[in-house]
Curated annotation (Swiss-Prot):
Entry EC number(s): 1.2.1.71
Name under which the protein is recorded: N-succinylglutamate 5-semialdehyde dehydrogenase
Residues annotated as the enzyme's active site: E243, C278
Catalytic activity: N-succinyl-L-glutamate 5-semialdehyde + NAD(+) + H2O = N-succinyl-L-glutamate + NADH + 2 H(+)
Organism whose genome encodes this protein: Aliivibrio fischeri (strain ATCC 700601 / ES114) (Vibrio fischeri)
Residues the record lists as binding NAD(+): G220, S221, A222, N223, T224, G225
MF GO annotations: succinylglutamate-semialdehyde dehydrogenase activity
Function: Catalyzes the NAD-dependent reduction of succinylglutamate semialdehyde into succinylglutamate.
Pathway: Amino-acid degradation; L-arginine degradation via AST pathway; L-glutamate and succinate from L-arginine: step 4/5
GO biological process: arginine catabolic process to glutamate; arginine catabolic process to succinate
Family: Belongs to the aldehyde dehydrogenase family. AstD subfamily.
Top class in the EC scheme: oxidoreductase
InterPro entries, per the entry: Ald_DH/histidinol_DH (IPR016161), Ald_DH_C (IPR016163), Ald_DH_CS_CYS (IPR016160), Ald_DH_CS_GLU (IPR029510), Ald_DH_N (IPR016162), Aldehyde_DH_dom (IPR015590), SuccinylGlu_semiald_DH_AstD (IPR017649)
Length: 485
């Protein structure tokens, strides 16, 4: 059972793909990818289901989505176990992902009413009406780091608005999507409303290239997102929503307050999920002087004692592995590159076997031209600064703009920071990876097109229809100049 198309499970006809557990390299899922013809079949199924689905009263669509939420609750532990086996994230963490899926459904229902409501008013003898209509067939591209939660945050708003969906998950996490699709199957969803196509690059290209989709909701790397952006540049008939990564800065003020609380906030920002969250801190700005020295010494001491292990270890880990051996090698190579440019490792990231990498901290202050890259893993770059204005200027020196943070007990510093920083998510004295599901999620620049996830995803799933209405045509008391009747 590999692909879910038009209400049936079908075997793939393309190249073989498999999912390897990153903590022991065992095969946890195997199948054949969808061919271009199978992708077209999935899109056609979604198109055929669209008219009846959008005509279904909202309350009926909501009932099916809420039934899915109940099934997720009932199967939360098994979902969490699959995600842990496939991504390597600690079991305690994947349990929170299953819970977040349920929470996002309630948020999406509220967002539908608040972001895409029906409104009417009277003006100059006319009834002015605002309605919202679904776009049609939506392609959803899911990432590997939150393979349940993040696709769910696009699928649910799309369905509530009356769209149908073709999901193409990351080739790193096909098992998770298959398990979740079976819950949608049990929810009473009509055939063709959601379709699942598994595969790697060729499958994704086939889905993005097809003329049959009306929009694409993407969460993933900036490189892939930019390819899609260029591809869609001449096609105004398709909506493209991009939620990509960031080279996220975290500035520590001299007035940072409690030392251990600050260190804890940094660790949660940089190393949670083994650094595989798009909002993770990548650059840490620390003041010059003894205060900064003491902070870094304590940070290194705490970080080197972070417990890294497989998800189900009896001694509960804080961090698991990278998603793959290739991803682990990428982080180690990034460290070597920064060292060659003049960076000094305060704590060297090391391979721990399979896809495990220990967290690393590197002082990049003396790197003349710091690469503006997202190192998607547990590698934190430290840059020393002298003034807050300098720190903010350096923090803004990136093409990205997803998340940023300031640790400071000084209100005036926060006022300056929030006024001058360029980022979509800006936190004070809280981890960068902390974000509210009912707030905008996204950022400017290379991080995407501003707010395509979380609460505001509703905006991307329906278009506004403005109407001026009257019961019958009327002739005004005074005709327009040059006109006679």
């Amino acid at each position: 059972m590999t692909h879910w198309i038009a209400g049936d499970w079908v075997l793939g006809e393309g190249e073989t793909i498999q999912s390897l557990s990153p903590y022991n390299s065992e095969v946890v899922w195997k199948g054949e990818s969808a061919t271009e013809a199978q992708v077209e079949s999935a899109v056609n199924a979604a198109r055929n289901a669209f008219i009846e689905w959008k005509k279904l009263p909202f309350e009926n669509r909501q009932a099916i989505v809420e039934r899915f939420a109940e099934l997720v609750k009932e199967n939360a532990d098994s979902i969490a176990e699959v995600i842990a086996k496939e991504t390597g994230k600690p079991f305690w963490e994947t349990k929170t992902e299953a819970g977040a899926m349920v929470g996002k459904i309630a948020i999406s229902i509220r967002a539908y009413h608040e972001r895409t409501p029906y409104k009417e008013r009277e003006a100059a003898g006319n009834k002015i009406v605002l309605r919202h209509r679904p776009l049609g067939v939506m392609a959803v591209f899911g990432p590997y780091n939150f393979p349940g939660h993040l696709p769910n945050g696009h699928i649910v708003p799309a369905l509530l608005a009356g769209n149908t969906v073709v999901l193409k998950p990351s080739e790193q996490t096909p098992w998770t999507s298959e398990v979740i699709m079976k819950l949608w199957q049990k929810s009473g969803l009509p055939k063709g409303v959601i379709n699942l196509v598994q595969g790697a690059r060729a499958t994704g290209e086939a889905l993005a290239n097809t003329k049959g989709i009306d929009g694409l909701l993407f969460t993933g790397s900036a490189n892939t997102g930019h390819i899609l952006h260029r591809q869609f540049a001449g096609d105004t008939g398709k909506m493209l929503a991009l939620e990509m990564g960031g080279n996220n800065p975290m500035v520590i003020s001299k007035a940072f307050g409690d030392l251990d609380a600050t260190v804890y906030t940094i660790v949660q920002s940089a190393f949670i999920s083994a650094g595989q969250r798009c909002t993770c801190a990548r650059r840490l700005y620390v003041p010059e002087g003894k205060q900064g020295d003491a902070l870094l010494a304590r940070l290194v001491d705490v970080t080197k004692n972070i417990h890294v292990d497989q998800p189900f270890s009896e001694t509960t880990p804080f961090m698991g592995p990278q998603i793959s051996i290739a991803a682990a090698e990428f982080i180690l190579n990034a460290q070597k590159k920064l060292q060659a440019l003049g960076g000094e490792s305060l704590l060297e990231a090391r391979s721990l076997g399979h896809a495990f990498v220990s967290p690393g901290i590197i002082d990049a202050t003396n790197v003349a031209e710091l690469p503006d890259e997202e190192y998607f893993g547990p590698l934190l770059q430290v840059i020393r600064y002298t003034t807050l204005a300098q720190a903010v200027e350096l923090a803004n020196d990136t093409r990205y703009g997803l998340s940023a943070g300031l640790v400071s007990t000084d209100d005036s510093e926060w006022d300056y920071f929030v006024e001058h920083i360029r980022s979509g998510i800006v936190n004070r004295n809280r981890q960068l990876t902390g974000a509210s599901g009912d707030a905008p999620f996204g950022g400017p620049g290379a991080s995407g097109n501003l707010k395509p996830s979380a609460y505001y995803a509703a905006d991307y799933c329906a278009y506004p229809m403005a109407s001026m209405e009257g019961d019958a045509c009327e002739i005004p008391e005074q005709l327009s100049p040059g006109l006679t009747l």
